[in-house]
Amino acid sequence: MSLGEGKLIYEGKAKRVYLINNEELVMEFKDEVTALDGARKEYAPGKGKLAASQTAFFMSYLNESGVRTHFINWDGDRRIHVRRLRMIPVEVIVRNYAYGSFIRRMPLIKPLTKFTTPLVEFHLKNDELHDPLILIEDIIEAGLTSMEQVMEIRSVSLKVNHLLSELLGKYGLTLVDFKLEFGVNSNGALVLADELSGDTMRVLMNGKHLDKELFRMGGSVKELIEAYSRLNSILGLGLKG
């Protein structure tokens, strides 16, 4: 399906967003990869299509499983058609295993220790401040959203974690952690937004990363594309970069 160009309204490290009309947007995934808050940036041919296909796969699955998402359809290439939302400037990280920034702030726990229950973290979405960890009370005091909506975000995030962990587990994959973003639609309902791909989740197959962690650890673009392609192959998406 071909998706129209629209008006460019946002460009970030990994995506461009185009306005189609008051209710709909197109998200275009770039053939670029960044790490270390953009300090390392390289051209990655085929990555956009791989990330878009993964997002389409996971978002479609969540839609079918009763989670309201912004996803409408995928053009078969680097673009997805989504619903326009009023975004909440908070990133949610759900952790099943100790890894990454969690280890840096809590070194008493060994890497890849499985948590007794999943952890849900809230981070202020702010590149200049490096998306700092914040409290629920911070969110309320800053007026970013209501306590009721924060609790709904937490509940939906845990549901998404359960669904994705179960799905990936069927393929022999381990979901270490992942990032979510949410928005509110014109009716005031909470909606899962942004993307779900190797860019925003850590997924292991027999202890090996099939996600952007490879690049963060100094791996090459070629290794990254091979990992994303491997994830697609395992999920039966039939795509290569």
UniProtKB/Swiss-Prot annotation:
Enzyme Commission (EC) number: 6.3.2.6
Keywords from the UniProt entry: ATP-binding, Ligase, Nucleotide-binding, Purine biosynthesis
EC class of the enzyme, as a word: ligase
InterPro entries: SAICAR_synt/ADE2_N, SAICAR_synt_PurC, SAICAR_synthetase, SAICAR_synthetase_CS
Any single Pfam family the record assigns to this protein: SAICAR_synt
Gene Ontology BP annotations: 'de novo' IMP biosynthetic process; cobalamin biosynthetic process
Reaction catalyzed: 5-amino-1-(5-phospho-D-ribosyl)imidazole-4-carboxylate + L-aspartate + ATP = (2S)-2-[5-amino-1-(5-phospho-beta-D-ribosyl)imidazole-4-carboxamido]succinate + ADP + phosphate + 2 H(+)
GO terms for MF: ATP binding; phosphoribosylaminoimidazolesuccinocarboxamide synthase activity
Pathway annotation from the record: Purine metabolism; IMP biosynthesis via de novo pathway; 5-amino-1-(5-phospho-D-ribosyl)imidazole-4-carboxamide from 5-amino-1-(5-phospho-D-ribosyl)imidazole-4-carboxylate: step 1/2
Family (UniProt): Belongs to the SAICAR synthetase family.
Name of the protein in question: Phosphoribosylaminoimidazole-succinocarboxamide synthase
Organism whose genome encodes this protein: Caldivirga maquilingensis (strain ATCC 700844 / DSM 13496 / JCM 10307 / IC-167)
